[in-house]
């Protein structure tokens, strides 16, 4: 994940900027840079690779300014090199950016026609030029940013530094986190409190849609409508590094809300958004074209991510996939054909059963690919190819952002397989990449349902049993929803394929039974409506998670209908996961359980 820092100080800030960026290294990065005001003039130092390269550059060409911004970058638009490293500048403004500007292509062409010259391949440079365009109309820095933000589509965090403005930083947040730090006559902006910890423990977290004008005397926060608002200043414990919830009551809530950002970063890691392509390592240790089958092994939530991936691989790549929970797979003595692909999914990369299955697959001459959140883990080290998820540290035991990042990674892998095997055309790939790019925005819109879901959880908390139903890729999501609810609320819940309702679960339906139906409007929607009618006829209380067309065509009375935006079918598991997670979370809060550390469960299961 990218990291952002901004400082208004009294002494030269270059060293402080680099120190803060070091605290953000855990997010991952491939280049870094800072910009300061030197006698009022914007001056940048940038470098590809690790921060030590930037430090060398600063030793050779020091900066002495007392106002500055800094950034660590994961490449999204454009290669990881010095030219594409942040900050980006245009005339009187420098900007650092975390996230994805979805409409950057359209804006870039518009700006080119107006005579703006681009040095980089990034979407960030578009933002710098847009602000410059507004300032050329006679607007000041604050007004120029206010005019620019509505032109941007996507999920992002931004920090601006302006030439000649020694006492102004401007930050903006939409979908990606940004915090304001308060010091003694000094002020700070940062991706999180971890970056700000060396300087201050007084931190205010911007809410989604907020933007802030920072001066040494304080900060003025405005919401998306431009109204001045107050955001509480809290004492941060970020000196303990990751033990920091921000404004959230639990880590799980924080991690649910981080998903637009981290899924965006994960997708960006595997996508060439400029050319509409999925990008994997240039030399794979196997050839998709010669594979006869693939297998997937995982545990818990990671297993459900693998179940979704099975649908994708079989649809996009016409590649048969066998999947099982690792604790079963490892003891089945399953027959393998030499030279096929074995995929292992694990948040920690240390899950014992998954690791044991990996070793068995290696003995059977399989190509081993892992999808992990810890690229230095044992599973990663023992794999032929590692595809990291960029979820960042996940503290809550119940997985949320790691799950959706696993889905994002596996989706990209399935599309790459389909392209390599000649099943997907170039146009198909472009369409899928466009759909993937929209996921962070769609997730942000899904999070807006939280107040409604919180009210609904009050009803769910009264239940002893809950049933989840889904078809297609919504079936694994039903399983995941049931797992989340039972993990953290301790309410018994089961997930079923909707078509299996009549083969047993229907016997449990009565007027006390909530039935959560995950059903975007797709080719099997009418079949799912038939199952809902069977539930309604027996008094079951239906909670429908769907889209506008689904809500319109569902001819069944529901206890509640949660309506998500219309989206491509491929991305529904990533986006529909959010209301499922929120429903479990708020039910658990009402039940008074230990949400982040539910009884009897551990984050990383390293025993068999």
What is each PLM-predicted segment?
Residues 1-245, 249-250, 258-292, 331, ...:
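Conserved short alpha-helical segments that host acidic/polar catalytic motifs at enzyme active sites
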Residues 49, 66-83, 274-286, 309-345, ...:
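Glycine-rich oxoanion-binding loops at beta->alpha junctions
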Residues 152-186, 456, 461-487, 522-524, ...:
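Acidic/histidine-rich
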Residues 181, 305-306, 322-323, 352-355, ...:
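Extended hydrophobic-aromatic, low-complexity segments
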Residues 226, 252, 541, 554, ...:
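Generic C-terminus detector
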Residues 259-263, 267-295, 364, 385-514, ...:
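Active-site phosphate/pyrophosphate-binding segments
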Residues 289-438, 518-562, 583, 591:
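Glycine-rich phosphate-binding loops that contact phosphosugars or nucleotide phosphates
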